[in-house]
Amino acid sequence: MMSPSIPPADTTDSDLMLVERTVAGDQRAFELLVIKYQRRIERLIGRMVRDVDLVEDIAQETFIRAYRALPQFRGDAQFYTWLYRIAVNTAKK
């Protein structure tokens, strides 16, 4: 999906700050969220779906849906919890 090499300073940004930056138009901020959570999301989906190619497709769709829904993210829950729910719902479809 995206390159896993990121400058160390970027990894200190909080998820909420990265969400806010993404909503404001900073594409790099969303890339950092994807890099941070891509493997966790793929492992989660992999427990639900055994086809490796399908796991990657569902993970990609999860991040697309999350990106589109970011303006509605209120921060009531942790970002990963919100992303987890999107991944599970996407995998069930």
Task: Cite the ranges covered by each PLM segment.
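Hydrophobic-face residues of short alpha-helical interaction/recognition segments
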Residues: 41, 45, 70, 83, ...
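Intrinsic, short, N-terminal disordered tails of RNA polymerase sigma-factor systems
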Residues: 1-24, 32-36
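Short, conserved catalytic or interaction motifs in soluble domains
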Residues: 50-51, 72-75, 88
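Structural recognition of an alpha-helix C-terminal capping motif at a helix-to-coil junction
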Residues: 57-64, 77-89
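Acidic/polar helix N-cap motif
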Residues: 25-26, 51
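Amphipathic, Lys/Arg- and hydrophobic-enriched alpha-helical face
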Residues: 34-52, 69
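Sigma70-family region 2
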Residues: 23-24, 63-78
